[in-house]
Amino acid sequence: MHELSYANAMLEAILNSIKKEEEKGKKIKKVTEINLEVGELTFINVEQLKFAFEVIAEGTVCEGAKINVEFIKPKCKCLDCGYEGEPEILDEFEVYCPKCKSIRLKLSGGKEFNIKNATVEYED
């Protein structure tokens, strides 16, 4: 389940950012929302990611944070027919040109996993 690895990376990145904010004198009480950009070619199961994050964030300022996911579509250039645009995706092993069905593609994008931003509550 690679979702657990992604959840761990998310939590670590957010807690590191919070630590930097606290070093500047800002005290963060709670993270309420986390917005992600996730490439479709990562094949991340969002429900499993949310569950894994919920479990590992327990007892931290991230406990109970709402996770929103924006999916990023991959782009391709077909090396056979020259098509440029979105590929057809059946699963992680079958990605092909929608025009000529070739698997000879140059892919770009679709593998991102970014924390776009997080909403926090500060202590008074």
Curated annotation (Swiss-Prot):
It holds the Pfam family HypA. Zn(2+) binds at C78, C81, C97, C100. InterPro entries: Hydgase_Ni_incorp_HypA/HybF_CS, HypA/HybF. Ni(2+) binds at H2. GO terms for molecular function: nickel cation binding; zinc ion binding. GO terms for biological process: protein maturation; protein modification process. Keywords: Metal-binding, Nickel, Zinc. Belongs to the HypA/HybF family. Involved in the maturation of [NiFe] hydrogenases. Required for nickel insertion into the metal center of the hydrogenase. This is Hydrogenase maturation factor HypA. It comes from Methanocaldococcus jannaschii (strain ATCC 43067 / DSM 2661 / JAL-1 / JCM 10045 / NBRC 100440) (Methanococcus jannaschii).
